[in-house]
Amino acid sequence: MATSGRLLCLCLVLGLIFESLGHPVMGEKRAGENASPSARSLPKRLGNVEAPCGNQTCQFGCCEDDVCRELNCEHVDFPNY
């Protein structure tokens, strides 16, 4: 019984030592690893969203009085695919 107790204590101490050294016992997943492939490729499929506005084109914004607005836009028109 004393041998099994010593072995248990040794395992616990070794576990604490390796944990303090930064060696993880189990690999941790990062946030993006659980996302589906279709969700990861969504920004690539959208591409650049540009809207004509006066003499220029607005990218990721809206056009008000021939000026591109990035903030306080009520809606953004996406092109039809």
UniProtKB/Swiss-Prot annotation:
GO terms for molecular function: toxin activity. Its main location: secreted. Residues 22-45 form a propeptide. It is found in: Secreted. It comes from the Eukaryota. Expressed by the venom duct. GO terms for cellular component: extracellular region. Residues 1-21 form the signal peptide. Contains 3 disulfide bonds. Transmembrane segments: none annotated. Keywords: Cleavage on pair of basic residues, Disulfide bond, Secreted, Signal, Toxin. Belongs to the teretoxin M (TM) superfamily. The cysteine framework is VI/VII (C-C-CC-C-C). This is Teretoxin Tsu6.8. The lineage of its organism: Eukaryota, Metazoa, Spiralia, Lophotrochozoa, Mollusca.
